[in-house]
Amino acid sequence: MLNIIGIGLRGTGSLTLDEFDALRTSDIVYLDIYTSIGPKDILEKLRNIADREIIPADRNMIESESILKDAEKLNVSLLVIGDGLTATTHNQLRYSAMEKGIKVKIFENASAVNTAAGKIGLLHYKVGPPVSLPFVSSNFFPLSVIDKVKRNYDSGLHTPILIDLKDGQNMPFASAWNIIMEMQKRKGVCNNRRKCMRCLEAFISG
């Protein structure tokens, strides 16, 4: 069995009772350290509150077959910062498990994607589909990011811009801003009147 457990945005403080029960009764517990960054001491606090070992799971572990192989025979839980199914990575893991006949249980929780807009006073129905902003280089500078932002903008919608992670660290705010400005310039759609707000590891652009 595979439990995908969203633990929310406040570390152990946002664990639900059902999630805590699943955490305590699992044979193996992993903490996703690839798709999002939690509080610095989140792993230690989870271990203490559950009184058990919790294994950090990086990209290679999550995208490999190792977690699914365990889940074929044991009760396995994957702890996810935020909500359990916001990231494509976790949805793909769920589908792969189901294809193998593994029972999957999802534990929902709050994520930056579904709380950022309200946090800064925007209405949810005025927020369009999110877009990911990757680290760029001289050989990789995807302007499709701005295409998606512009599509939302032309529809009167704000855009959540999800900032990429690298080596366990968020892209600095200033770097993200400069990349967005350069992308707009290259696409010929530069508009300095647009506003970006930093919120919960995310931008809401509009």
From Swiss-Prot:
Question: Which portions of this protein are annotated as coiled-coil regions?
Answer: none
Q: What class of enzyme is it?
A: transferase
**Which residues are involved in binding S-adenosyl-L-methionine?**
L9, D83, T86, S111, A112, I163
* Enzyme Commission code: 2.1.1.98
Q: Please state the pathway this protein functions in, per its UniProt record.
A: Protein modification; peptidyl-diphthamide biosynthesis
Keyword list, A-Z: Methyltransferase, S-adenosyl-L-methionine, Transferase
Residues spanning the membrane: none
One Pfam family assigned to this protein is TP_methylase
Q: Which GO terms describe its biological process?
A: methylation; protein histidyl modification to diphthamide
Q: Please write the reaction equations for the catalytic activity of this protein.
A: 2-[(3S)-amino-3-carboxypropyl]-L-histidyl-[translation elongation factor 2] + 3 S-adenosyl-L-methionine = diphthine-[translation elongation factor 2] + 3 S-adenosyl-L-homocysteine + 3 H(+)
Q: Name one GO molecular function term.
A: diphthine synthase activity
Give a yes or no for keyword Ribonucleoprotein in this entry: no
Q: Which SUPFAM superfamilies match?
A: Tetrapyrrole methylase
Which InterPro entries did the record assign? 4pyrrol_Mease (IPR000878), 4pyrrol_Methylase_sf (IPR035996), 4pyrrole_Mease_sub1 (IPR014777), 4pyrrole_Mease_sub2 (IPR014776), Dphthn_synthase (IPR004551)
Q: Taxonomically, which superkingdom?
A: Archaea
Task: State the family named in the UniProt similarity comment for this chain.
Answer: Belongs to the diphthine synthase family.
Q: Which purpose does this protein serve, as stated in its record?
A: S-adenosyl-L-methionine-dependent methyltransferase that catalyzes the trimethylation of the amino group of the modified target histidine residue in translation elongation factor 2 (EF-2), to form an intermediate called diphthine. The three successive methylation reactions represent the second step of diphthamide biosynthesis.
PANTHER family registered for this protein in UniProt: DIPHTHINE METHYL ESTER SYNTHASE (PTHR10882:SF0), DIPHTHINE SYNTHASE (PTHR10882)
| Record-linked HAMAP family | Diphthine_synth
Describe its partners and assembly state.
Answer: Homodimer.
According to UniProt, the name of this protein is: Diphthine synthase
- This protein's species is Thermoplasma volcanium (strain ATCC 51530 / DSM 4299 / JCM 9571 / NBRC 15438 / GSS1)
Question: Taxonomy-wise, where does this protein's organism fall, top ranks first?
Answer: Archaea, Methanobacteriati, Thermoplasmatota, Thermoplasmata, Thermoplasmatales
Annotated gene: dphB
